[in-house]
UniProtKB/Swiss-Prot annotation:
Superkingdom of source: Bacteria
Keywords for this protein: ATP-binding, Cytoplasm, Kinase, Nucleotide-binding, Transferase
GO biological process, one term: UMP salvage
Family: Belongs to the uridine kinase family.
InterPro entries: P-loop_NTPase, PRK/URK, Uridine_kinase, Uridine_kinase-like
Gene Ontology MF: a single term: uridine kinase activity
Pfam families, per the entry: PRK
Species in which this protein is naturally found: Geobacillus sp. (strain WCH70)
Enzyme class: transferase
GO terms for cellular component: cytoplasm
Positions contributing to ATP binding: G12, G13, S14, G15, S16, G17, K18, T19
Entries under SUPFAM superfamilies matching the protein: P-loop containing nucleoside triphosphate hydrolases
Protein name, per record: Uridine kinase
Subcellular localization, as worded in the UniProt entry: Cytoplasm
Amino acid sequence: MGKKPVVIGVAGGSGSGKTSVARAIYEHFGDRSILVLEQDFYYKDQSHLPFEERLRTNYDHPLAFDNDLLIEHIHKLLRYEPIEKPVYDYKLHTRSDKVIHVEPKDVIILEGILVLEDERLRNLMDIKVYVDTDADIRIIRRLLRDINERGRTLESVIEQYVSVVRPMHNQFVEPTKRYADIIIPEGGHNHVAIDLMVTKIRTILEQKSFL
């Protein structure tokens, strides 16, 4: 039986610091052996829908994600085959025509708010992580990200948080904490937790004869 990459799932609420955790792990191993696969890139294609209908998309609901494609891509990466990762256009609220070529690596970090929600995804993971951060900090980070990076207005972000993000977090995201092997408070700023994770990843890599 050939070697298979290590898959790490990093979940947590929007603005919890998942990306910081993924980046901190990435920096320990470097580009040669690790890749980050963001669930955000795998929102469903909505090009068949009128723009007004796309505006009503609930991006925090499990059904917003094309997990079938994501799982297909993970299986390819586990076979050391490259993938063409989709790109999502947040201004048009649908999948872009562009794709990103991704080469397989020894460590795959799967990062997203609901990566622990789908049992099929969980079954592909060697380590399951939940990043736990105060709601106040999460909403501030989401405000800054959506306004600066996604062209949103302050009013629209606040309205979406109150009507969609917070209830979806409580209903779908927070409950996935029970599936986590590791719960990390404070995200990427928790250096002790990051170091412990890096040590665990190295152990798994050694067991799989990568190191």
